[in-house]
Amino acid sequence: MSGHTDADEIHEILRNSTTGLVHLKDYQRVKQNIVEKREKHALSTTSTKIKKRKDALSKKVKQGIKVNKGKLSFGEDEELENDDLPLKKVEKKMFMGKDPSADTSFLPDAEREIRENAKRAEYRKQWLKEQEQIREKEILIPFIYYDGTSTTYHVRTRLKDSVGHFLADMKQQIPFLKRILDMDKFLLVQSDLIIPHHHELYYFYINKVQGRDGLLFDFDKLSCSSPEMVATTQLPSQCIPHLVQKSYYLQNRHVFPCVHWEVFDSRKDYSLEKHATDPNAALFYRPS
């Protein structure tokens, strides 16, 4: 249809501007002019429509005019209505508020954290106070001086005392040992374990350190209310602390029971081991 219109228009132009036969080049030139003229006209028309559409939309946004849903429109009005759809969608968005029934306990709360930290600090302060009272409490416990035979004595000590201090108090209960001032010459042996001097008795209490026969130091069983109670205690000998001179240990470490003694290692689990026994070791467990 377009081709027929172009031919008629070309024929009309050639008839008005020429006479007789027309060369092919003249025909093509006239046709090209017509096509260019139409393209320019179409481009101009499109630009005008776009400008009108933008102006109308801008005016509508500024004035806040809403398009009626029931209105019928045609042509450009319909296009403008379609262009307005995103705007109407924005208007329909609902405001999202807080839900008062939602659980927010898991969310960070500065005030709650401050209260909890204060409670923890108070609990820790109370616990430290209780532990200090335990450390300061004086207890009476039995001990054995071992030099091949076993002699039972008793001594007052506190859990906060170091093993070295504990040995010094034990030594003071035995007259012929008082003159020895060098504490490195004495060992504390508990359940076949040589306890280093730097450890506190409280360490074994609070950590419930296990030996080969249960608690390494069972202070609840060791504690006595009086010296008379110490004399009648029925605790197994291996559960009672032993004061031993280092010279005796070095001379007899190849024989029972010294051969089984070893230095205590806090990283080791002694509950997995068994206490050494020897039917010929009666002297080691015989009270005097």
Curated annotation (Swiss-Prot):
Its main location: nucleus. Coiled coil: none annotated. InterPro entries: FAM50A/XAP5_C, XAP5. GO terms for cellular component: chromatin; nucleus. It is found in: Nucleus. It comes from the Eukaryota. Keywords: Nucleus. GO terms for biological process: chromatin organization; mRNA cis splicing, via spliceosome. Belongs to the FAM50 family. This is FAM50 family protein C1020.12c. The gene is xap5.
